Amino acid sequence: MQEHVMSRTLARALRPAAAALAALTLALAAGCASENAALSNARYDLGPAGPVATAGRGPALKVLDVAAPEALDSDKFVYRLAYADAQRMAVYRDSRWTAPPAQLLTQRLRGALSSRGAVLEGADGVRAPTLRIDLSEFEQVFDGESQSHGAVTARATLTQDGKVLGQRTFVARAPSSTPDAAGGARALAMASDDLVAQIAAWVGMQAYAGTP
């Protein structure tokens, strides 16, 4: 009888601890689920833009939307396992860009070039020299299972009154700090900034007249 009473007393004493443990377990599970959900729906952009050196002020320039092939004309995050199959592109299942890379680069480029003069869009009716960018590569390239880099390649064409004033292909590379989408996003942001800086410097060296 005495043992039965002691067992009931012990059970009552342990109930609060058991309830607290259960609540803690549920909280941890909810936290893990929330974290996993966040990680499984990651959205990346290029981050804040850094300063771009320009060669003084220049005339107005019309900057068209960056053009891209179908594979890069979406918010999918593209990567390539160069060490295993360099000809095959793949996409992350749970990581995407906030907008197609071409749109992100368009914003970045217009922002950088605006520091040297007025930047017009393609829909503007003003006659002005026109810069067209054709994006051909924007991906995280894995050189090994634990090593990757961001790769961005684009061709810039500057025209005025139907005449080509200059054309050049630009290539930018930046190492990834981690072999995953987060590391790839940081690397591609750095490579994008490098590419934009190269294009801005090239535009600054071209000889073209302003609007009449």
Regions found by a protein language model. Name each.
Residues 33-52, 111, 115-161, 178:
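Surface-exposed short loop/turn segments
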Residues 57-62, 75-77, 127-131, 148-154, ...:
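Envelope-exposed proteins and targeting segments
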Residues 110, 114-118, 200-208:
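Sec-exported extracytoplasmic/periplasmic mature domains
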Residues 66, 134-139, 171-173:
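Generic short beta-strand segments
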Residues 33-101, 206-212:
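A structural "domain/chain start" motif
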Residues 85-96, 163-201, 208:
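Short secondary-structure boundary motifs at beta->alpha junctions and helix caps
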Residues 27-31:
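C-terminal motif of bacterial Sec signal peptides marking the signal peptidase cleavage site
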Residues 3-21:
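Bacterial N-terminal signal peptides that target proteins for export
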